[in-house]
Amino acid sequence: MEQNKIPQATAKRLPLYYRFINNLNQQGKKRVSSKELSEAVKVDSATIRRDFSYFGALGKKGYGYNVEYLLGFFKSTLDQHEITEVALIGVGNLGTAFLHYNFMKNNNIRITIAFDADENKVGTDIGGVPVYHIDELGERLKNTEVAILTIPADEADAIANQLVEHGVSGILNFTPARITVPSHIRVHHIDLAIELQSLVYFLKHYSLN
Protein backbone atom coordinates (compact mmCIF):
# COMPACT_ATOMS: atom_id res chain seq x y z
CA MET A 1 0.00 0.00 0.00
CA GLU A 2 1.38 3.41 -0.92
CA GLN A 3 2.11 5.70 1.97
CA ASN A 4 -0.42 8.28 0.81
CA LYS A 5 -3.10 5.57 0.96
CA ILE A 6 -2.48 4.79 4.62
CA PRO A 7 -5.55 5.60 6.76
CA GLN A 8 -5.26 9.01 8.38
CA ALA A 9 -5.82 7.52 11.83
CA THR A 10 -2.77 5.30 11.29
CA ALA A 11 -0.70 8.21 9.99
CA LYS A 12 -1.49 10.22 13.13
CA ARG A 13 -0.16 7.40 15.33
CA LEU A 14 3.19 7.05 13.54
CA PRO A 15 4.95 9.88 15.46
CA LEU A 16 3.72 8.29 18.71
CA TYR A 17 5.28 4.96 17.75
CA TYR A 18 8.48 6.67 16.64
CA ARG A 19 8.92 8.52 19.93
CA PHE A 20 8.55 5.33 21.99
CA ILE A 21 10.84 3.29 19.71
CA ASN A 22 13.44 6.05 19.85
CA ASN A 23 13.31 6.00 23.66
CA LEU A 24 13.76 2.21 23.66
CA ASN A 25 16.76 2.49 21.37
CA GLN A 26 18.35 5.08 23.66
CA GLN A 27 17.86 2.64 26.55
CA GLY A 28 19.71 -0.05 24.60
CA LYS A 29 16.71 -2.33 24.15
CA LYS A 30 16.98 -4.68 21.16
CA ARG A 31 13.41 -5.87 20.63
CA VAL A 32 9.87 -5.07 21.68
CA SER A 33 6.54 -6.88 21.51
CA SER A 34 3.25 -5.42 20.32
CA LYS A 35 1.98 -5.89 23.89
CA GLU A 36 4.79 -3.73 25.27
CA LEU A 37 4.14 -1.13 22.60
CA SER A 38 0.44 -1.22 23.43
CA GLU A 39 0.98 -0.63 27.15
CA ALA A 40 3.40 2.23 26.50
CA VAL A 41 1.48 4.21 23.88
CA LYS A 42 -2.04 3.28 25.09
CA VAL A 43 -3.09 1.81 21.73
CA ASP A 44 -4.44 -1.75 21.67
CA SER A 45 -2.05 -4.34 20.24
CA ALA A 46 -4.44 -5.36 17.44
CA THR A 47 -4.48 -1.76 16.19
CA ILE A 48 -0.68 -1.60 16.35
CA ARG A 49 -0.33 -4.81 14.33
CA ARG A 50 -2.84 -3.51 11.78
CA ASP A 51 -1.02 -0.17 11.55
CA PHE A 52 2.29 -1.91 11.00
CA SER A 53 0.79 -4.29 8.43
CA TYR A 54 0.31 -1.39 6.02
CA PHE A 55 4.09 -1.26 5.68
CA GLY A 56 4.74 -4.96 5.15
CA ALA A 57 6.54 -7.34 7.51
CA LEU A 58 8.03 -5.19 10.26
CA GLY A 59 8.22 -7.97 12.84
CA LYS A 60 8.24 -11.74 13.35
CA LYS A 61 5.64 -13.80 15.16
CA GLY A 62 6.99 -14.98 18.48
CA TYR A 63 9.92 -12.57 18.32
CA GLY A 64 8.31 -9.16 18.18
CA TYR A 65 9.94 -6.18 16.55
CA ASN A 66 13.59 -5.32 16.16
CA VAL A 67 13.98 -1.90 17.78
CA GLU A 68 16.88 -0.72 15.61
CA TYR A 69 15.08 -1.78 12.43
CA LEU A 70 11.83 -0.10 13.50
CA LEU A 71 13.69 3.08 14.40
CA GLY A 72 15.33 3.23 10.98
CA PHE A 73 12.00 2.53 9.30
CA PHE A 74 10.13 5.28 11.17
CA LYS A 75 12.96 7.76 10.66
CA SER A 76 12.67 7.19 6.94
CA THR A 77 8.87 7.17 6.88
CA LEU A 78 8.59 10.38 8.92
CA ASP A 79 11.46 12.06 7.04
CA GLN A 80 13.43 12.50 10.25
CA HIS A 81 16.56 13.19 8.23
CA GLU A 82 14.99 16.31 6.70
CA ILE A 83 14.52 19.52 8.67
CA THR A 84 11.06 21.08 8.37
CA GLU A 85 11.22 24.81 9.02
CA VAL A 86 8.11 26.23 10.70
CA ALA A 87 6.87 29.81 11.01
CA LEU A 88 5.08 31.00 14.15
CA ILE A 89 2.45 33.72 13.79
CA GLY A 90 1.63 35.43 17.08
CA VAL A 91 4.16 35.83 19.89
CA GLY A 92 1.79 36.06 22.85
CA ASN A 93 1.96 33.78 25.89
CA LEU A 94 1.32 30.59 23.93
CA GLY A 95 3.51 31.61 21.02
CA THR A 96 6.37 32.52 23.35
CA ALA A 97 6.09 29.13 25.03
CA PHE A 98 6.39 27.46 21.62
CA LEU A 99 9.52 29.46 20.84
CA HIS A 100 11.20 28.42 24.08
CA TYR A 101 10.20 24.77 23.63
CA ASN A 102 10.78 24.67 19.85
CA PHE A 103 10.11 20.94 19.55
CA MET A 104 13.41 19.96 21.14
CA LYS A 105 12.43 16.26 21.13
CA ASN A 106 11.63 16.30 17.42
CA ASN A 107 14.84 16.12 15.43
CA ASN A 108 13.26 17.26 12.18
CA ILE A 109 11.02 20.18 13.21
CA ARG A 110 12.20 23.68 14.06
CA ILE A 111 10.49 27.04 14.39
CA THR A 112 12.93 29.28 12.53
CA ILE A 113 10.99 32.53 12.20
CA ALA A 114 8.20 34.33 14.08
CA PHE A 115 5.89 37.25 13.37
CA ASP A 116 3.90 39.64 15.56
CA ALA A 117 2.31 43.10 15.39
CA ASP A 118 3.63 44.24 18.79
CA GLU A 119 6.47 46.70 18.24
CA ASN A 120 7.93 45.74 21.61
CA LYS A 121 8.45 42.18 20.37
CA VAL A 122 9.51 42.95 16.81
CA GLY A 123 13.28 42.84 16.46
CA THR A 124 13.76 40.63 19.50
CA ASP A 125 15.12 37.10 19.63
CA ILE A 126 13.14 34.55 21.65
CA GLY A 127 14.58 31.09 22.15
CA GLY A 128 16.98 31.73 19.30
CA VAL A 129 14.17 32.64 16.90
CA PRO A 130 14.00 36.15 15.36
CA VAL A 131 10.68 38.00 15.59
CA TYR A 132 9.61 40.17 12.64
CA HIS A 133 6.65 42.48 12.12
CA ILE A 134 3.61 40.79 10.62
CA ASP A 135 3.74 43.27 7.74
CA GLU A 136 7.02 41.64 6.69
CA LEU A 137 5.44 38.22 6.32
CA GLY A 138 5.48 38.22 2.52
CA GLU A 139 9.07 39.42 2.39
CA ARG A 140 10.49 37.13 5.06
CA LEU A 141 8.51 33.93 4.56
CA LYS A 142 10.64 31.94 2.13
CA ASN A 143 10.48 28.18 1.48
CA THR A 144 8.32 27.62 4.55
CA GLU A 145 5.51 25.10 4.15
CA VAL A 146 4.22 24.92 7.73
CA ALA A 147 2.95 27.64 10.06
CA ILE A 148 1.53 27.78 13.57
CA LEU A 149 -1.23 30.29 14.33
CA THR A 150 -1.43 31.66 17.88
CA ILE A 151 -3.21 34.95 17.16
CA PRO A 152 -6.63 36.46 17.99
CA ALA A 153 -9.50 34.63 16.29
CA ASP A 154 -10.67 37.69 14.37
CA GLU A 155 -7.30 37.89 12.61
CA ALA A 156 -7.01 34.21 11.73
CA ASP A 157 -8.67 34.17 8.29
CA ALA A 158 -6.77 37.18 6.96
CA ILE A 159 -3.42 35.84 8.15
CA ALA A 160 -4.20 32.35 6.85
CA ASN A 161 -4.90 33.82 3.42
CA GLN A 162 -1.51 35.54 3.46
CA LEU A 163 0.21 32.33 4.48
CA VAL A 164 -1.40 30.41 1.63
CA GLU A 165 -0.53 33.18 -0.80
CA HIS A 166 3.13 32.86 0.17
CA GLY A 167 3.41 29.11 -0.18
CA VAL A 168 2.39 27.65 3.18
CA SER A 169 0.55 24.36 2.69
CA GLY A 170 0.03 23.24 6.29
CA ILE A 171 -1.35 25.24 9.23
CA LEU A 172 -1.56 24.25 12.90
CA ASN A 173 -4.35 26.51 14.12
CA PHE A 174 -4.53 27.25 17.85
CA THR A 175 -7.16 29.98 17.44
CA PRO A 176 -10.87 29.34 18.18
CA ALA A 177 -11.67 30.31 14.57
CA ARG A 178 -12.33 27.65 11.93
CA ILE A 179 -10.30 29.24 9.16
CA THR A 180 -11.32 28.94 5.51
CA VAL A 181 -8.56 27.87 3.12
CA PRO A 182 -8.37 26.24 -0.34
CA SER A 183 -8.97 22.49 -0.46
CA HIS A 184 -5.30 21.69 -1.10
CA ILE A 185 -4.24 23.28 2.20
CA ARG A 186 -4.18 21.05 5.28
CA VAL A 187 -5.29 22.61 8.57
CA HIS A 188 -5.22 20.96 11.98
CA HIS A 189 -7.34 22.78 14.56
CA ILE A 190 -6.39 22.63 18.23
CA ASP A 191 -8.78 24.54 20.49
CA LEU A 192 -7.54 24.15 24.05
CA ALA A 193 -10.77 25.51 25.56
CA ILE A 194 -12.88 22.94 23.71
CA GLU A 195 -10.51 20.13 24.67
CA LEU A 196 -10.76 21.13 28.33
CA GLN A 197 -14.56 21.42 28.16
CA SER A 198 -14.72 17.97 26.58
CA LEU A 199 -12.51 16.53 29.32
CA VAL A 200 -14.71 18.00 32.05
CA TYR A 201 -17.85 16.68 30.33
CA PHE A 202 -16.43 13.17 30.01
CA LEU A 203 -15.34 13.20 33.65
CA LYS A 204 -18.90 13.99 34.70
CA HIS A 205 -20.81 11.72 32.34
CA TYR A 206 -18.52 8.84 31.36
CA SER A 207 -17.06 7.26 34.47
CA LEU A 208 -14.03 5.00 33.99
CA ASN A 209 -14.82 3.06 37.16
From Swiss-Prot:
Gene3D superfamilies, alphabetized: NAD(P)-binding Rossmann-like Domain, Winged helix-like DNA-binding domain superfamily/Winged helix DNA-binding domain
A molecular function GO annotation: DNA binding
GO CC terms in record: cytoplasm
GO biological process entries: negative regulation of DNA-templated transcription; response to redox state
Keyword terms: Cytoplasm, DNA-binding, NAD, Repressor, Transcription, Transcription regulation
Protein name per the record: Redox-sensing transcriptional repressor Rex
Species this protein is from: Oceanobacillus iheyensis (strain DSM 14371 / CIP 107618 / JCM 11309 / KCTC 3954 / HTE831)
Role, per record: Modulates transcription in response to changes in cellular NADH/NAD(+) redox state.
Gene assigned in the entry: rex
Lineage: Bacteria, Bacillati, Bacillota, Bacilli, Bacillales
Pfam family, one: Put_DNA-bind_N
Location in or out of the cell: Cytoplasm
Transmembrane segments: none
InterPro entries named in the record: CoA-bd (IPR003781), NAD(P)-bd_dom_sf (IPR036291), Rex_DNA-bd_C_dom (IPR009718), Tscrpt_rep_Rex (IPR022876), WH-like_DNA-bd_sf (IPR036388), WH_DNA-bd_sf (IPR036390)
UniProt xrefs under HAMAP family: Rex
DNA-binding region positions on the chain: 16-55
Record-stated family: Belongs to the transcriptional regulatory Rex family.
Summary of subunit composition and partner proteins: Homodimer.
UniProt-annotated binding residues for NAD(+): G90, V91, G92, N93, L94, G95
SUPFAM superfamilies: NAD(P)-binding Rossmann-fold domains, Winged helix' DNA-binding domain
